[in-house]
Design a protein with these regions (language model features):
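Nucleotide-sugar donor-binding catalytic core of glycosyltransferases
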Residues: 1-212, 218-219, 224-238, 248
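Catalytic binding pocket for nucleotide-activated donors in carbohydrate/polymer assembly enzymes
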Residues: 189-315
Length: 317
């Protein structure tokens, strides 16, 4: 897909500029290592994370949009959990999965955790893929074009996603795999396509919430998805901001969601879709609530202001 600027790039650049102004008594130096690939995308030099480090004692604040929070406790990737004083994560983190992961990983000497995660963890808000096209997004939200009465998904159909929908064969449920030829679209075309349909299906990926969720919120297309357990300060409420089709999604063991039964998930998905698809008043209700949540939390400036209100550099001493 194409766009002007990646959201993560814009957010981190603006964050750096604001930090320099707010803390003019300090000197901020950007450290980038082109060899970050040896650590991988979840390593300390990943473009998906931003660390504020005290060079004297190496204490740090971590802000991450990487799609697997477990990597941030792995020593071979360069992280030191005991020196992590604040951990800001947007994609999906809850304490049940964290403590389960910690317990089942007791014998893994590569892992290092903070002394008290409840004092360290902070949420901030997930985002659309690109920082662009806000006029077009608003135009799409306000458009009243007739919709196709279908539930729609376009994305990477990894094996764990295929298991979620294998065997579903209905004309009113459309699933397009971007791994297939000619199934990847430029960004605006992608948003316009979502807007054509009654409901956007969100199949979780490497982390609980997806760019697709936020993009669908932004253009006013109701999202059907499994329950979100994210600890946002402004909570995403099931059946108010999005339509919940399944009660639980476990991320404690791998970077992929686990369900009690894929067959059970499919039954609940179809049941929920059939229940809501003719209820225009309810779908409009979800659409408005989700759009309001997006505007309040997910635009660059609002998300940045929220982050800056929570970052505490005194903890780095």
């Amino acid at each position: 897909m194409g766009g002007n600027k990646f959201y993560v790039t814009s957010l981190f650049k603006k964050l750096m500029d604001r930090l320099k102004k707010l803390y003019s008594e300090h000197t901020f130096t950007i450290e980038i290592d082109d060899s970050y690939e040896k650590y991988g995308q979840g390593g300390i030099f990943s473009c998906m994370s931003f660390s504020i480090i005290n060079p004297i004692n190496k204490n740090y604040v971590l802000i991450s949009l990487f799609d697997n929070w477990k990597y941030h406790f792995m020593k071979h990737l360069g992280w030191e959990g005991k020196k992590m004083k604040q951990f800001f994560y947007a994609g999906g983190f809850n304490f049940l999965d964290y403590f389960d992961f910690k317990q089942i990983s007791k014998s893994n000497t590569d892992l290092e955790f903070p002394e008290n995660i409840s004092e360290v963890f902070n949420s901030f808000f997930y985002n659309p893929y690109f920082d662009c096209c806000y006029d077009e997004i608003t135009t799409l939200y306000n458009s009243n074009d007739e919709k196709k009465d279908k539930m729609f998904f376009r994305g990477w159909m990894w094996d764990f996603r295929k298991k979620m929908v294998n065997g579903i064969d209905r004309d009113d449920i459309l699933i397009f795999d971007k791994n297939q030829v000619s199934q990847n679209l430029d960004y605006i075309s992608y948003l316009k396509e979502i807007k054509k349909y009654l409901v956007s299906l969100s199949l979780p990926g490497g982390t609980e919430v997806c760019n697709r969720d936020i993009e669908s919120f932004s253009i006013g297309v109701p999202v059907i998805r499994p329950h979100l357990q994210i600890n946002y300060d402004d909570p995403l409420i099931q059946n108010y901001h999005y339509i919940n089709c399944y009660h639980y999604c476990d991320y404690s063991k791998d970077g992929n969601p686990k369900f009690i039964s894929h067959e059970d998930f499919q039954k609940n998905l179809i049941y929920t879709w059939d229940k809501v698809k003719t209820n225009k008043e309810y779908l409009d209700f979800i659409s408005k609530n989700a759009r309001d949540w997006f505007l309040k939390n997910c635009t660059i400036d609002n998300n940045l202001n929220f982050l800056l209100s929570k970052i505490n550099l005194e903890l780095l001493h």
